[in-house]
Amino acid sequence: MSISLLQQERHRYLPKVPDLLRGDFRRVCARRGLSTTAVADYDALRSLFARTYGQPLVNFVNASEKNEDSPMETAPEPRGLRVAIVLSGGQAPGGHNVIAGLFDGLKRWHADSVLIGFLGGPAGVLSGDHIEICADRVDAYRNTGGFDLIGSGRTKIESESQFAAAAQTVTRMALDALVVVGGDDSNTNAALLAEHFVNSGISTKVIGVPKTIDGDLKNEAIETSFGFDTATKTYSELIGNIARDACSARKYWHFIKLMGRSASHIALECALKTQPNVCLISEEVAAQSLTLAQIVQSLCDTIATRAQHGEHFGIVLVPEGLIEFIPEMKALITELNEVMARRAQEFEALDTPDAQRVWIEQALSASARAVFNALPAEISTQLLADRDPHGNVQVSRIDTERLLILQVTERLAQMKQEGTYTGVFSSIAHFFGYEGRCAFPSNFDADYCYTLGLTACLLAVHRFTGYVASVRNLTSSVAEWAVGGVPLTMLMNMERRHGSQKPVIKKALVDLEGMPFRVFSRRRASWALKTSYVYPGAVQYYGPPAVCDEPSVTIRLERPAPAANSSFGHRSS
């Protein structure tokens, strides 16, 4: 197979790891902290996870760090372990380094250890479709993007027959542990599997690894999910390139939609990196109950003011999930989903788009109908055409950036007639998503993911189940990073999914009181009127650490001065 010169060089990159993980794993001890609860719905979750709820936080420490008030558990006698890994959900840069870290950790623990990769995501767990990951295989994928070593998938393990199939697979393969690499839904699956295995007397432990470029799987113990750093650096390069083009041509407004359906972390991080004229934050729209008309008017005011200064160009960042945070649009989508769930067969029986449109207008309430009819035809058609297997609107397929362009164009024409706008408006729409999911991981993600793999190995060695690997102190030097495990139930609450209450890991949305948003909100008025673009350039892998190794702006603002010892949840000495 032919590979690029960069890939050849990246194969040689040796990820930096915390000092704790450099030595003999037999010298690494587990220190249990305080028992945990959940985000909310404690009683319901305690009932559903009777065997794994309330487990303590875990910190891994050197055997020399003795503390009588917080005793340590030494590592068991080394033996060969059989561990499997599955990649679940969408791709994120660094997944192959999680596999590499887990593989290297297992071989360091005992030469007879075996790492197995389930193929095609959770479906591979159900079918037993797998490969053994040997040194040659993993070496060919070190520090590379993508999940193509074993593939990924979006199958959810949720029915009784699926749990039984998973149990049969891990039992037949005599697995000591199953490592699930995924986002909130995938790690929710991991928690359910861990509980099921314990209840069934199956010894296989289940361990999660936090993955999502969206950045919405985090809390005090999980400082960031892997892939966010690389993806936002990749998008920011593209935004910077477009901003430079806009500043050169001086005649286009670029509306750029960015991945992030549930949270606006990607848009916010890219805004902090590139300083666009406008960046919409979905969480702020919801908090202020801003209507579509208000958002459009705000955009038009910025465009008109810049035009007065001869600047008929600009950059607007739009989070992918914005449309679901606009109150009247959220109500419309909710009603559409309910109507389609109840009367899907009636809708599907109609043989023309016009007939479907008339039918849906009659089925909607008066308020929802008014919103639906006010939308541009191409957008309302998308609401009806793009639906998931449950009949729900697929929000990610709605061209929100096009919706804004169409509405802004219409409103600016009205403002011209009113005499409040005298400029020229030309627009271009973009969507950046897949461009960032499989990039070569940044040095930060390469180091972080490799460390996550080593940490998952330690959790398997020490026989923990129902935990997600945690690496902290991420704004310190890598040598000072701290590692451990967080009970998955600690991240959970109950939410309504497809008509019933389900246990799920709660998504971390943009905190409007947090430092990243506060810094953004202080500066955005200036960026709106004064062209202040920053051009980050491509992700750098070689050169000064300030250029190559810096983590995201978000995490640096959230955690500017980590404590020297950030062990969490354990009894103080």
From Swiss-Prot:
HAMAP family: Phosphofructokinase_II_Long (MF_01980). Belongs to the phosphofructokinase type A (PFKA) family. PPi-dependent PFK group II subfamily. Clade 'Long' sub-subfamily. It comes from Treponema pallidum (strain Nichols). It is found in: Cytoplasm. It catalyses: beta-D-fructose 6-phosphate + diphosphate = beta-D-fructose 1,6-bisphosphate + phosphate + H(+). CDD domains: Pyrophosphate_PFK. This is Pyrophosphate--fructose 6-phosphate 1-phosphotransferase. The active site is at 214 (proton acceptor).
